[in-house]
Structures are given as C-alpha cells and as structure tokens.
C-alpha cells in the first residue's frame, strides 16, 4: 500500500492552524492587499467606465421591466410581481453603508460575497440575484453586478408606478470579500447583553457600526432585542439611520416608501429553514436557506419570520402606508413563525393575499413601522407626508437616490443618461474649472515663489498632506480637490493645527493672488492646486536637502469649493480620530494606534510598502501633528532621508515603554543610557512586526537612499491624486 493511500490528504495550502489562531492580536496587514489584480479576472486594459458607456441602458431597463412580472416556478413572485423583492435587494446592497468610515454600501457588489450573502437580514436575496443572472449574462462586462443591483431596484420602483429621482452607473465590481469590521459578536443576531456586545452604557452603539445586531442591516423590526416597543425602537432607528447619513425626514420617507411595496415572509417556524449560502451544500450552487416548510416557497416562504403586508397596493405606489398607520389602532400579535408584529384593530380584510386572489387580510405592521407614529418627531413628519402625498413622493425619491448613491463619491464618477441634473449638497459639490490651467512653466515659477515665501518644508508638506489625506477610498469622499481645508469644519480640526494652518493658507493665498492678478487670457491657479503644488515643492526641496534629485508629478485641474457647497455636519465625519502618518491620536482608544494606522492606510488605498515609505518620509519631513518629536529619528530634519529606518533598526538603541499605557517609548543608547529618541506605537511597529520590519529593512539599507526617495514620491503622488477621478 502506498503512502498516499495510507495517509489522508489533509494538508492543503492555507489550511491548518493559522498565525491568527496562534497570535490573535497580531497586526493584520491583509486589508492593505485586498482587491488586487491577482483576484480580478478582467483584462489589464479593461475600463469599466468605457464599457458602461457602450451599454444600451434602455434595453437593460426594458429587460428588467419584463422580469418584474415573469414569475418563476422555482421562486414565485409575490402578487405576481418581483418589485418588492428587488427593492429590498437594492436597499440591502446600499444599506450597509455607514458614515463613520465610509465602508459598506453598494459599490463593489459585496452582497455577492460572505458575510453579506449569508446575513440573516439577507435571507432570500440569493434568489433575487439568481433571478437577475440571465440579464447579467446577456450584458456581461458592460454592466457590473454592483450597478445592476441598484438599477434593478430603481426599475422595480418605476414598474410599480413610482417616479425615481435618477440613476448613475459607475460602480466597479470587486472579486473577493471586503475585510470590514461588522462587530465582535460570534453569534448571528446576538442580543445586546451578550458577550462582545456592540452596546455600552444605556444604549450607546459602538463606532463605526450602524446596525443594532450582528447580521442586520439597520434595526430589529420586532423592536430592540426583539422587544415590541415602538418608542424604544425609534431610538434605534434614529441612531442607525443617522449613521447612514439620513436625517429624520429621509428616514421616515425611506421606511414608509419602501414598505409601500411587497411583504415580509414568515409562513412557518424558522426551524424549517436550512443553512445559509456559505454553509449550504455544493448541490445548492450558492443558494441557501432551503426550507422544508410546505413547498418552501411562495405562500410557504420564510425569510424574516414576520408575515406583514403593509398596503392594499403592494405592487403600486400609493399613500396607503400612512393611511393604514393613522387610520387604525394596533394590537400586538405574532406571525405564524412566532415573531412579534401588529395587526389593525376593527379593520376589514383589505390587504390582498400574495398568491390567492380569493383571500384578503387585515393590515399588519412591524414594531419599527409604528415608531413613525408614536415617536413625536417621526409622527409630525409622517402626518405631513400623509396629508401631502406629492411631498412624500419627492422625499422618498430623493432619499432613495441618496441611499443608493451615497458611497459613490462626487458626481464626476456618475455615468449614464439617467444622472439627475441637480447638484446635491451631500455629493460634496466642487465647481467646474472655468479658467485656463497653468502650464509647466507656471508650475516651475510657482514652486519657486512658494519656496521663497518663507514657508518651511514641514509647513508645505503638512498642509498638502492634511488637505489630501481626508480621502476615503471606501466612499470616495474627501481629498485635496475643493481645498476644503480652508473651510469649516476642516480648518478647525485639532489634527490640522488651526493657528499654524491659517498662517500657511494666508501665505499661499498671497502667492495665488499675485499669480492670478498678473495673468492675461483667463489663466488661473486654484488654491486647491496650489496647496498640492506647494507640497510637491516641499518634497522636492527635502529630497535635494538629502542629496537626491526628484520630480514630483503634478496635474492641475482642481477647483475651490465654497462654504455654501460644504455640509459641515456631513464633512465632520472625515475628521481623523487617528492619523498615524502624522503620529496623531485625538483620544486614547481601545484599538491600538498601529491598527488605526493600518485602517487609515486602507482608506487611503495604500499597500504596506506605500504605507511604510510614507510614514518614514513624513517623520523626517516634520509632518507630525503638533510638531511632536516622537518618531523623528533624524538629526537632519526636512531632508528626505531614510534616517527613520536606519535609526529604528539600530541595535545600539534599546527601547522601553515610559507610559502606563505602553504607547510612548524611549530609545536609549545601550552603552551610555542616554535618551536618543522617543517614539509611539506607530513608530515602533515598523521594527516589531515581522512583515513591516522586512519592509523597513529594505528602506534602511545602505543602498536605499534613492529608492526610498523615489518610492516616497510615488506614494505621495498617489495620495495627492486619489480624488482626481477626472484623471482616471
């Protein structure tokens, strides 16, 4: 007998006990290397924007309209129309978005992948996506799954008589799951009192989370932890919807508008429902939740466990939701699956059955629906919408557009003929460039003016970084375009050293005015461009100080936003609570500073080598917040040297923590005991973490002087242009 037949083959690559099992607190750099070309099946020269522009969008919409009423035996349509199912699919695709870090949302089509494809709140959406496959198959690469999911929701609304606000394509598919923090609970739908709860205090939801339980999009429809209390549920609704950038009016419009259509499904006990897609057998082919209750579909379907139809027009836009909400008193009951829900007292049977035209039912509501009546603020808005149907329709159209486009970033990324003409404040509008751009000669002249202005390398670099590093690759917000660093709230953020920033901006504005006043023919430089250009001049000068010649690329074309074009409250979420690139922590956090650095780097779409080069360079250029000396491992400040790495890796230095929290360290000369340097956790991680140390050793080597400078410039230029979608 051969060895192969004796021994079971159980040692495949990637299996076995992992590093994470051995060292659960080890810094995870994997999030910096997601969504690379290695997982993307598209050709290297594939341009999705160009592919989408060739799409016959009207033909796609026509096919989607036909699908709405083409009920399939394997998953029959409620009321003969898939509209309600597809509205829920689109809502749940977009509704994972949260403002705190911009993660989640419809971009990338993440609903196709774990964990979202198997969340308890997404039961049966596997069927919705499978219904769409023939259309996706037909149009192929010209429409992404991410775009198709949202377009289908829009067409569903339109097919049921609702006029939508518009639609934009441009969401590029991802090909692997995002690595997003959805909570620490180990059990789906874990209650708030359980281990690793996301709640503290009276009911304070952990940031950045925007859902009340693991596996839910927003709130528990039965009420907080399943307690059927509409007033208490209103607290959860307000908190979670606000964390998705929705105010009270938008929240009411979305709930009432969405619940005008379709129904929930709770025909029988949840014990009849099988494993979710990620745990189902191969034979299920990516589907999940196979039910043994009756036929397991149609009238026997089990999704949320609730059995509610809100309106008498579940496939047609109407004002029935508010009519029923206010026309009846409501009594608590339970669904056939045992879930808490509400039924109208003394109401007639006015609600159609989803599959039997001879049957009617009394109106039913969810606990969270009744919140719109029994919360005083929601009730006021709800009555106004009830009495003014046109206002309600407009509010829902706008809120739905915001919900489904919030994570797309600026209008420059919007594609297609259905993009609405109106510019909206939440899109962080930036005026179109209305002047002739500066040329190479102007760039050189402006660099000279900036360097002669009295501003230091540190000031130039720090200001450019502060302007550009607000960018978030998650929701494409922030960045240098718009020069919002000179506006509230950014100009007042602690990390930006407001008093120092004001001096720098005043000097740069003087350079800008002198240049613009001297021009003829309409040529101008925007402050947004000048801030980035000044940073480039600072980096070039720093490299020169180190004996290296570099040219930082520069592309003009940024414009200056106004205060009126800036939503102060919405912009406030971009304020860094931590920026390891500037050695900044606003407060002490439970999450280690080095993990916050990696999180920031991921939002900046940086790789581990890019992050390493930027930290090492920014330290020696004096970009620390508050001019702190931690991590400034050089006696040649404002020179773009590799001193940070050389001195960090020097075995002549012994490091010891000097704070109770182990977040400040002193590096002493091993021979004399003299303090040589001070550093933060962010600084020391580049010598402690094996993978980061390997990168630090590259840049700390004797032959790395020029390589480091050029790598820093490349990473710097990347950050400066992250929001330049016009250059893509």
UniProtKB/Swiss-Prot annotation:
The keyword Iron applies. Binds 1 heme b (iron(II)-protoporphyrin IX) group per dimer. Disulfide bonds: none annotated. GO terms for cellular component: cytosol. Bifunctional enzyme with both catalase and broad-spectrum peroxidase activity. One of its GO terms (biological process) is hydrogen peroxide catabolic process. The lineage of its organism: Bacteria, Pseudomonadati, Pseudomonadota, Betaproteobacteria, Burkholderiales. The record marks 88 as: Transition state stabilizer. Pfam families: peroxidase. It catalyses: H2O2 + AH2 = A + 2 H2O; 2 H2O2 = O2 + 2 H2O. There is a cross-link at residues 218-244 (Tryptophyl-tyrosyl-methioninium (Tyr-Met) (with W-91)). This is Catalase-peroxidase.
């Amino acid at each position: 007998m051969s060895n192969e037949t004796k021994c079971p083959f159980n040692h495949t690559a990637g299996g076995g006990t992992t590093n994470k099992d051995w060292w659960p607190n080890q810094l995870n750099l994997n999030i910096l290397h997601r969504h690379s070309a290695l997982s993307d099946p598209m050709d290297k020269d594939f341009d999705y924007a160009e592919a989408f522009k060739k799409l016959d969008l009207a033909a796609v919409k026509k096919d989607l309209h036909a699908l709405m009423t083409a009920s399939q035996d394997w998953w029959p349509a409620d009321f003969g129309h898939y509209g309600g199912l597809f509205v829920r699919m689109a809502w749940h695709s977009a509704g994972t978005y949260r403002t705190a870090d911009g993660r989640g949302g419809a971009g990338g089509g993440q609903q196709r992948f774990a964990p979202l494809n198997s969340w308890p709140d997404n039961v049966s959406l596997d069927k919705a996506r499978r219904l769409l496959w023939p259309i996706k198959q037909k149009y192929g690469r010209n429409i992404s799954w991410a775009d198709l999911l949202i377009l289908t929701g829009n067409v569903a609304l339109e097919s049921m008589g609702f006029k939508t606000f518009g639609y934009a394509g441009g969401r590029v598919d991802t090909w692997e799951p995002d690595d997003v923090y959805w909570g620490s609970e180990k059990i789906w739908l874990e209650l708030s009192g359980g281990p690793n709860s996301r709640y503290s205090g009276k009911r304070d939801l952990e940031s950045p989370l925007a859902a009340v339980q693991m596996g839910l999009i927003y709130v528990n429809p039965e009420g907080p932890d399943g307690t059927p209390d509409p007033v208490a549920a209103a607290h959860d609704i307000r908190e979670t919807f606000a964390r998705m950038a929705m105010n009270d009016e938008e929240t009411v419009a979305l709930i009432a508008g969405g619940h005008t259509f379709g129904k929930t499904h709770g025909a029988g006990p949840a014990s009849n429902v099988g494993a979710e897609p990620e745990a189902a057998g191969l034979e299920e082919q990516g589907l999940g939740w196979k039910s043994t209750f009756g036929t397991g579909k149609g009238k026997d379907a089990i999704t949320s466990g609730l059995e509610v139809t809100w309106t008498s027009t579940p496939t047609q836009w109407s004002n029935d939701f508010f009519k029923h909400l206010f026309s009846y008193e409501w009594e608590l009951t339970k669904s056939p699956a045992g879930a808490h829900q509400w039924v109208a007292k003394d109401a007639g049977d006015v609600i159609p059955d989803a599959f039997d035209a001879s049957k009617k039912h009394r109106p039913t509501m969810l606990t969270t629906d009744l919140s719109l009546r029994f919360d005083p603020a929601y009730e006021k808005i709800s009555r106004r919408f009830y009495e003014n149907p046109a206002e309600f329709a407009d509010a829902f159209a706008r809120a739905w557009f915001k919900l489904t486009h919030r994570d797309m970033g600026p209008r420059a990324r919007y594609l297609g003929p259905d993009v609405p003409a109106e510019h909206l404040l939440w899109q962080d509008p930036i005026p179109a460039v209305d002047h002739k751009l500066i040329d190479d000669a102007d760039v050189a002249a402006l660099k000279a003016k900036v360097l002669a202005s009295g501003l230091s390398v540190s000031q130039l670099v720090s200001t450019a970084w502060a302007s550009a590093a607000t960018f978030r690759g998650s929701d494409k917000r922030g960045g240098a375009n718009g020069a919002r660093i000179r506006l509230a709230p950014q100009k007042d953020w602690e990390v930006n050293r407001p008093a120092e920033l004001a001096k720098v901006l005043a000097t740069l504005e003087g350079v800008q005015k002198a240049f613009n006043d001297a021009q003829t023919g309409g040529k101008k430089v925007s402050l947004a461009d000048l801030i980035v250009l000044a940073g480039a001049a600072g980096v070039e000068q720093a490299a020169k100080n180190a004996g290296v010649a570099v040219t930082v690329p520069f592309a003009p074309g940024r414009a200056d936003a106004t205060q009126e074009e800036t939503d102060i409250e919405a912009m406030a979420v971009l304020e860094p609570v931590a920026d390891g690139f500037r050695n900044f922590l606003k407060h002490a956090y439970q999450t280690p500073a080095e993990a916050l650095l990696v999180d920031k780097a991921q939002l900046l779409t940086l790789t581990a080598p890019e992050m390493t080069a930027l930290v090492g360079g920014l330290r020696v250029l004096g970009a620390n917040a508050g001019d702190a000396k931690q991590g400034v491992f050089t006696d040649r400040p404002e020179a773009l040297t590799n001193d940070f790495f050389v001195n960090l890796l020097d075995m002549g230095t012994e490091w010891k923590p000097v704070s109770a929290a182990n977040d400040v360290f002193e590096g002493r000369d091993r021979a004399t005991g003299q303090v040589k340097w001070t550093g933060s956790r962010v600084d020391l991680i580049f010598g402690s973490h094996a993978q980061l140390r390997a990168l630090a050793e590259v840049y700390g080597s004797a032959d790395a002087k020029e390589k480091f400078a050029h790598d820093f410039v490349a990473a710097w230029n990347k950050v400066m242009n992250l929001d330049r979608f016009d250059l893509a």
